Amino acid sequence: MSGAKIIPFNSRGGLRFGVYMGGVSEAHHELATGKPDIPEEINRALDLLQGDKQFLVRTYLGFTGTEQDAELVDMPSMPDLARYTWRGRKLDLVLSNWDRCCNLAAWVEFIENVIARYGPYIGCLQICEEPNLYDYPGDGRFGCAVDNILTGVKVAHQKLKQRALSASVGFNAVPCSDPNDGFWREIADKMDTAFINALDYVGLNFYPDVAVPLVGDLAKEVTSVLTEFREETLRHVGIPGSVPIHICENGWPTGPYRYYTRQAEFVERSVRAVQDLRGKLNITHYELFCLRDADTANPDLNHQFGILRDDYSPKPAFDVYRELVAELGV
């Protein structure tokens, strides 16, 4: 790897691509079980997807409000994350908050420790995960999500600036058509100018045709979801159009009657729909979920989200995504 070409990570215009580097079992243990990651195989696949472009590697750390949090940052976890940042790749590092006690002081300390430990490897730092999802795996299950975001974004922005680090800071959500949703109402009531000034992006996780079968055209569905998110949800709460949208998670699992060819088509059509909306809606990033299956033999859809099988052999969608990165990425 030492002789590999390094791709500078900067703020040029265009879509920045990425992928969650594991399987569902590594990110959400209650949704799937499977084989452990093989870092060498992951890096091989990431090199192929990246080509000569910038590339993000999405991964997750969880804050629980216990002594384990300090251990998480001080353990040899750092090499486990840094080893995927060859050739100029950066982490899209998600800090989930699973603390039921709403200990903001400990949350701030956790964010500061993560930045001190991982800062140079981070391209995007996401504060909380799916805070408007009130069931597993969303952070909305635990309460205080809005305070965790408002405080966390400002603290992270300040600490990165103090260290002269250029990572972007933001939060994400899942689609919501309810104008009275408590999360967004609380965001609108509590956010201030300092928060908006510290906010580099708002992310969206969305999975058309997964939990709910899609009726109609995929590109139209992507367009509808993203347009509503920008022009209704974000506008309604006062987040300006100058704040970019990141597509943080988007994917389609294979399985019985869920064919590899359909997954490849999903990736192609979804990415091109996002590209078509990039200028109009100020979308700057697209990240696929996820790189490999948790367990290719398991027919449950949560086990087959990958564009690689669990033995790291490619499905057709892998080459489709690689070609899209080469064509549309920066």
Give the ranges of each region predicted by the language model.
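Extracytoplasmic/secreted cell-surface and envelope-processing proteins
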Residues: 66-70, 100-102, 134-138, 179-180, ...
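Aromatic-rich peripheral "rim/lid" segments of glycoside hydrolase catalytic domains that contact
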Residues: 3-45, 84, 117, 131, ...
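Aromatic-lined carbohydrate-recognition surfaces of secreted/lumenal glycan-active proteins
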Residues: 145-146, 150-186, 234-255, 280-294
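An active-site-proximal structural segment forming one wall of the substrate-binding cleft
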Residues: 80-91, 100-129, 144-161, 182-199, ...
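Short helix-terminating capping/connector loops at secondary-structure junctions
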Residues: 11-13, 50-53, 86, 120, ...
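Alpha-helix N-cap and loop-to-helix initiation/capping positions
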Residues: 33, 37, 69-73, 102-106, ...
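N-terminal substrate-binding region of glycoside hydrolase catalytic domains
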Residues: 2-113, 119, 126, 132-133, ...
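Aromatic- and acid-rich polysaccharide-binding/catalytic face
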Residues: 59, 87-99, 122-123, 129, ...
